[in-house]
């Protein structure tokens, strides 16, 4: 109900009705009052004119009785005529009740003294009680020449008339006026409602459009064809709606681009407001914050507080467990609505760069060491032979064997470096063929039989000779050679090395398992990285270059497969190779 009363249509309709009703009431009152006054005046004027004629007739007539009788024929109500010579000397014995009361009114009302003393016409409304009811009469006194035996300056012609006919006429006029006003008000009500509805229809459309715009719907554009202010308002609103839609689309596009850029960044990005609340973050930042420890959180909070105080860009290094970050905080004057300031935090994960830098350092140290040792041996034994220190044939042969072994070691190191460089420059190519896996494993079995016996290792091969795989023989030979060499290097006499085949619905699987020293958990994620080497104390004798497992991974991935490692420190390591089955 209240919502309807608040409607512009209802308000405008009620306003029009109120104005029209007020005007009709005032006009009706004025009309009724005027008509009452008009008929009263007309009656009074008619009575006065009758009184004047009777007065003139009486004054000019010599026979007063005949003049009075004749006068009674001149008026509408002959019984309402009284000619009084003396106000204070009148007999009421033969008069009717009404005339008695009228005569008493003339005698007792001082206003009528002016008729007898001053010769003025006097009119009064007199209420007469008769038969238990009251009736109003108009009583007019008109002066005439004093008659004989009169003690006053003037005699008076008095005429009275019942006002009931006037009242009936006024009542009829009042009823007609009220009925006319009601009919006019009804017509006005309908017309006002129609007019207000028509006038406010464009406004209601604009209201609906504004509601839709507030809800994000800019497609509704009402058509208002009028040329008035409402039509101009509608056109302006439609134009505004179009511009808002364009601006919102532009802002949405900018926001989407910004969010996409922020989410695609490799750095974690956080937006912090004055209340130290996170109002913006990307996926990388969420991942970092989910895995951050309390000390790192305290570090970030301190840097954020320092940035709020200094309002300068701060850049600091953060080390957390085995990960390394560079944290940059920048002060922003306006980061959210209301002109509130804040801080943008950028967290860059530098773990890979740090590890790569460390691996390069280790690689340089290892390669230098690997090169220095065989070169020193080559130099020492060749100098011994050249200088004649070693002269016995057996000693010379032994020295040359050492020189040959160290030369092979240098050649292997250089070849690995060249292979990696070639892979980086040209990529790795494999020539896959469908062939029995037994061909590869038989080759490995023969190749490492003597080495296993020499090292005291129990090496077993368990595979199905009829099963065929899709692989490059030379490349897979390189992979297994590297893995079995590693297993031999990290085991001791009595340990086991097992090479086993398996399969699932879509892949052929090869396990290389040893019971050696194993790999610590913190090294597992990095064993396939370039130049990465685990603790040298784990190895038996010679160390590698840190490139073997990296090359293995590249070869397996080029086959469309994967390589993984599982290890438990002190219990052994298992490398798992998965290759797609032949189509």
UniProtKB/Swiss-Prot annotation:
Residues 197-249 form the HAMP domain. Residues 1-11, 196-583 are cytoplasmic. It comes from Staphylococcus aureus (strain MRSA252). GO terms for biological process: osmosensory signaling via phosphorelay pathway. Member of the two-component regulatory system SrrA/SrrB, which is involved in the global regulation of staphylococcal virulence factors in response to environmental oxygen levels as well as biofilm formation. Also plays an essential role in host-derived nitric oxide resistance by regulating hmp/flavohemoglobin, an enzyme that detoxifies nitric oxide by converting it to nitrate. Functions as a sensor protein kinase which is autophosphorylated at a histidine residue and transfers its phosphate group to SrrA. It comes from the Bacteria. The modification Phosphohistidine is found at residue 369. It is found in: Cell membrane. Residues 366-583 form the Histidine kinase domain. Its EC number is 2.7.13.3. It is an enzyme of class 2 (transferase). GO terms for cellular component: plasma membrane. The gene is srrB. Keywords: ATP-binding, Cell membrane, Kinase, Membrane, Nucleotide-binding, Phosphoprotein, Transferase, Transmembrane, Transmembrane helix, Two-component regulatory system. GO terms for molecular function: ATP binding; phosphorelay response regulator activity; phosphorelay sensor kinase activity; protein kinase activator activity. It is a multi-pass membrane protein. InterPro entries: HAMP_dom, HATPase_C_sf, His_kinase_dom, HisK_dim/P_dom, HisK_dim/P_sf, HisK_sensor, Light-responsive_reg, Sig_transdc_His_kin-like_C. Residues 33-174 are extracellular. This is Sensor protein SrrB. The chain crosses the membrane at residues 12-32, 175-195. It catalyses: ATP + protein L-histidine = ADP + protein N-phospho-L-histidine. SMART domains: HAMP, HATPase_c, HisKA. The keyword tRNA processing does not apply.
């Amino acid at each position: 109900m209240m919502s309807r009363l608040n409607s512009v249509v209802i308000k405008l309709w009620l306003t029009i009705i109120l104005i029209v009703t007020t005007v009709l009431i005032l006009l009706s009152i004025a009309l009724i009052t005027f008509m009452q006054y008009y008929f009263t005046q007309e009656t009074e004027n008619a009575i006065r004119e009758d009184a004047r004629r009777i007065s003139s007739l009486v004054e000019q007539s010599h026979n007063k009785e005949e003049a009075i009788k004749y006068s009674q024929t001149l008026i509408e109500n002959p019984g309402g005529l009284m000619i009084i010579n003396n106000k204070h000397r009148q007999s009421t014995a033969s008069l009717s009740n009404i005339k008695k009361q009228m005569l008493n009114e003339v005698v007792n009302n001082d206003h009528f003294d002016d008729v007898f003393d001053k010769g003025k016409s006097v009119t009064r409304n007199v209420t007469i009680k008769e038969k238990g009811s009251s009736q109003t009469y108009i009583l007019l006194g008109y002066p005439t020449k004093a008659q004989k035996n009169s003690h006053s300056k003037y005699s008076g012609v008095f005429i009275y008339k019942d006002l009931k006919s006037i009242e009936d006429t006024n009542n009829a006029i009042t009823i007609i006026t009220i009925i006319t006003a009601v009919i006019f008000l009804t017509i006005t009500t309908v017309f006002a409602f129609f007019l207000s509805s028509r006038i406010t229809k464009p406004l209601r459309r604009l209201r609906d459009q504004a509601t839709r715009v507030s809800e994000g719907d800019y497609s509704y554009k009402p058509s208002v064809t009028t040329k008035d202010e409402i039509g101009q308002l509608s056109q302006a609103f439609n134009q505004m709606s179009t511009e808002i839609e364009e601006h919102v689309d532009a802002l949405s596009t900018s926001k989407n681009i910004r969010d996409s850029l922020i989410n695609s960044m490799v750095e974690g990005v956080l937006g912090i407001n004055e209340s130290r609340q996170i109002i913006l973050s990307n996926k990388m930042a969420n991942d970092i914050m989910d895995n951050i420890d309390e000390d790192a959180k305290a570090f970030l909070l301190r840097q954020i507080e320092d940035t709020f105080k200094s309002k300068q860009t701060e850049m600091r290094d953060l080390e957390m467990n085995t990960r390394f970050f560079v944290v940059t905080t920048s002060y922003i004057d306006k980061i959210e609505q209301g002109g509130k300031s804040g801080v943008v935090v950028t967290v860059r994960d530098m773990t890979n760069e740090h590890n790569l830098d460390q691996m390069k350092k280790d690689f340089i140290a290892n390669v230098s060491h690997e090169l220095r040792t065989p070169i020193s041996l080559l130099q020492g034994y060749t100098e011994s032979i050249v200088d004649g220190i070693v002269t016995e044939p057996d000693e010379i042969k032994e020295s040359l064997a050492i020189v040959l072994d160290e030369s092979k070691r240098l050649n292997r190191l250089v070849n690995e470096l060249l292979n990696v460089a070639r892979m980086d420059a040209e990529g790795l190519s494999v020539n896959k063929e469908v062939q029995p896996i037994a061909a590869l494993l038989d080759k490995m079995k023969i190749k490492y039989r003597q080495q296993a016996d020499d090292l005291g290792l129990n090496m077993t091969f368990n595979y199905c000779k009829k099963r065929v795989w899709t692989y490059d023989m030379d490349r897979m030979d390189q992979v297994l050679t590297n893995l079995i060499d590693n297993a031999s290097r990290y085991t001791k006499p009595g340990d086991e090395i097992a090479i086993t085949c398996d399969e699932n619905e879509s892949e052929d699987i090869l396990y290389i398992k040893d019971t050696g020293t194993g790999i610590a958990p913190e090294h597992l994620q990095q064993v396939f990285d370039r130049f990465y080497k685990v603790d040298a104390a784990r190895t038996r004798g010679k160390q590698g270059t840190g490139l073997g497992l990296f090359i293995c991974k590249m070869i397996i991935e080029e086959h469309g497969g994967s390589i993984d490692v599982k290890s438990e420190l002190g219990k052994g390591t298992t490398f798992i190779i998965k290759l797609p089955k032949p189509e």
